[in-house]
């Protein structure tokens, strides 16, 4: 976490950083993550809550696969809009090796699946459009950052009096964290996060593997 903080602070503050998980010249995110959809979801949640202007390479939002070593065309395979029998928009210029009917659920099916990676992108993009602090705000860190378990990625986004606290559990373990910041309410979560008040000044937050919670302060 401290490495990330140092990296962000090294960037110019008079320009907007462009953030991404992958592009057309790299292996697709889900392939780099060994096909682990939970890791791809937390990566998306992080991308859409950190500062900067996020760039989403087409197909990331439905978990498309692709490895550049097999050729550039295989990280640029056709987008799966719907089941192939009814997909009039799917291009035919290549027979895909990675993003096929058996490996990637088409968009029309993911729209109706509350646990799909598409719904993660949809949720966090809506949050960015709802909370100006996520889209435009400064990104800062708790003063006691080093005291937190390294399983957690914790930061604040703040803009025009609006302040959010974002906590990501980036590990494969369920972990609990105590926070003393004055919580107004939970804005959103990913992964069935639970929290309870310990006393008037602190809360206990239990986070499943690769989960996220956003608090309004």
Name each model feature, range by range:
Residues 9:
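Metal-dependent DNA phosphodiester-chemistry modules and their immediately adjacent helices/loops
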Residues 24, 124, 210:
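A residue-level signal for conserved active-site and pocket-lining positions in enzyme catalytic cores
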Residues 2-3, 12-14, 28, 34-176:
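Loop/helix patches that line or flank the sugar-binding groove of alpha-linked glycan CAZymes
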Residues 174-195:
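Beta-strand-rich binding/interaction modules
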Residues 198-217:
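C-terminal beta-strand-rich structural cap/linker in extracellular carbohydrate-active enzymes
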Residues 17-27:
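Aromatic- and acid-rich polysaccharide-binding/catalytic face
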């Amino acid at each position: 976490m401290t490495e990330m903080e140092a990296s962000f602070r090294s960037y110019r503050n008079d320009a907007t950083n462009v953030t991404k998980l992958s592009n057309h010249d790299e292996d697709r995110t889900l392939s780099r993550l060994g096909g682990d959809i939970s890791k791809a979801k937390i990566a998306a949640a992080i991308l859409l809550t950190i500062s900067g202007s996020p760039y989403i390479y087409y197909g990331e939002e439905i978990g498309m696969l692709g490895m550049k070593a097999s050729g550039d065309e295989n990280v640029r395979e056709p987008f799966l809009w719907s089941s192939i029998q009814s997909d009039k928009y799917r291009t035919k210029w290549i027979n895909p090796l990675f993003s096929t009917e058996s490996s990637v659920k088409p968009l029309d099916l993911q729209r109706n699946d509350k646990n799909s990676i598409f719904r993660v992108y949809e949720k966090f993009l809506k949050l960015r459009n709802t909370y100006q602090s996520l889209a435009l705000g400064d990104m800062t860190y708790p003063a006691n950052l080093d005291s937190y378990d390294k399983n957690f990625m914790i930061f604040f986004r703040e803009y025009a009096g609006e302040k959010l606290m974002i906590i990501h559990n980036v590990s494969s373990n369920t972990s609990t964290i105590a926070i003393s910041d004055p919580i107004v309410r939970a804005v959103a979560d990913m992964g069935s996060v639970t929290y309870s008040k310990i006393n008037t000044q602190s809360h206990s937050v239990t986070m499943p593997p690769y989960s996220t919670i956003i608090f309004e302060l």
